[in-house]
C-alpha cells in the first residue's frame, strides 16, 4: 500500500494520499490549496490516478484543495451527506463504504467539532479529521459545533474501535504524526471524563480565538 502523510506548517494540517500500489487509483484526504502542485507532482511520480478527494469537514483554518484538484484531475469530490459544500460531487452516508482500486474506507458520522464532521476508517487505521486529535479533541464553539455531540461521537463511535487502531488526525501542533485508540483512551486528557456534561464543561470554557483564516476559509470551502 502507498500511504503518504504530508504537512502544512501554516495551518498544522495533515493531508493523506492513499493507493494500493503504483500505477493504481488514489485518493487524497484533507488537502490544502497551497500544496496542490506538490500533490499532483507526487501522484505523477508514483504513476497514480487521482479519483477521489475527501474533506472530513468544512475547514476553518485553511482553504481546501478539493475544488482545484477536481479542476485539474476531474476527480470526484467527497464529503459526508450533512455538508453544505457546493464543491462536493459525492455525499456519503454514515457507515457507507468508499471503494477505489483495492482500498476501502468506511464513513462514520461524528458531529461535534462541526455539524458536518465525518471520520473514515481504513483497515487498521482511522482518519479522524478534527474530531479526535493526538492528546486533544477538536473545539466545538463554531460552525454549529456541539460539545455533547462531540462527546457522543468520541465515546460511542471512535473509542469503541479496537485499541490498536491507528489514529491519523487532520491536525497536530506538536510534531506528533499518529497515535492509537488505546493510547488516546489512556492518555488524552480530554477523554478522562465520566459524562457528556463533564466534557461539555471543559469544552465550553476553552475561550479560544477564532482561526485567523476563518472568515476566508469557510466561504471558500463552502462555495469553491
Regions from the PLM with identified roles:
Residues 1-48, 119-129, 135:
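Conserved beta-strand hairpin/beta-sheet module of binuclear metal-dependent hydrolase folds
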Residues 12, 23, 31-107, 186-197, ...:
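Active-site HxH/HxHxD metal-binding segment of metal-dependent hydrolases
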Residues 17, 97-122:
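Core dinuclear metal-dependent hydrolase active-site scaffold
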Residues 31, 58, 82-83, 113-114, ...:
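Active-site metal-binding loops of divalent metal-dependent hydrolases
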Amino acid at each position: 500500500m502507498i500511504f503518504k502523510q504530508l504537512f502544512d506548517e501554516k495551518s498544522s494540517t495533515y493531508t493523506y494520499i492513499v493507493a494500493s500500489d503504483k500505477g493504481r487509483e488514489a485518493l487524497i484526504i484533507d488537502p490544502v490549496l497551497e500544496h496542490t502542485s506538490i500533490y499532483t507532482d507526487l501522484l505523477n511520480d508514483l504513476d497514480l490516478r487521482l479519483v477521489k478527494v475527501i474533506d472530513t469537514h468544512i475547514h476553518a483554518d485553511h482553504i481546501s484543495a478539493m475544488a482545484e484538484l477536481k479542476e485539474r484531475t476531474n476527480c470526484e469530490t467527497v464529503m459526508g451527506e450533512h455538508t453544505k459544500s457546493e464543491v462536493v460531487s459525492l455525499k456519503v452516508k454514515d457507515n457507507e463504504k468508499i471503494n477505489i482500486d483495492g482500498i476501502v474506507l468506511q464513513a462514520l458520522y461524528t458531529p461535534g467539532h462541526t455539524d458536518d464532521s465525518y471520520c473514515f476508517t481504513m483497515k487498521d487505521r482511522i482518519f479522524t479529521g478534527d474530531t479526535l486529535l493526538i492528546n486533544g479533541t477538536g473545539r466545538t464553539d463554531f460552525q454549529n459545533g456541539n460539545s455533547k455531540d462531540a462527546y457522543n461521537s468520541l465515546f460511542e463511535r471512535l473509542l469503541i474501535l479496537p485499541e490498536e487502531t491507528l489514529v491519523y488526525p487532520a491536525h497536530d501542533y506538536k510534531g506528533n504524526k499518529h497515535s492509537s485508540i488505546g493510547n488516546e483512551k489512556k492518555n488524552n486528557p480530554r477523554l478522562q471524563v465520566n459524562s457528556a456534561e463533564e466534557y461539555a464543561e471543559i469544552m465550553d470554557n476553552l475561550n479560544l480565538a477564532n482561526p485567523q483564516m476563518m472568515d476566508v476559509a469557510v466561504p471558500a470551502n463552502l462555495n469553491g
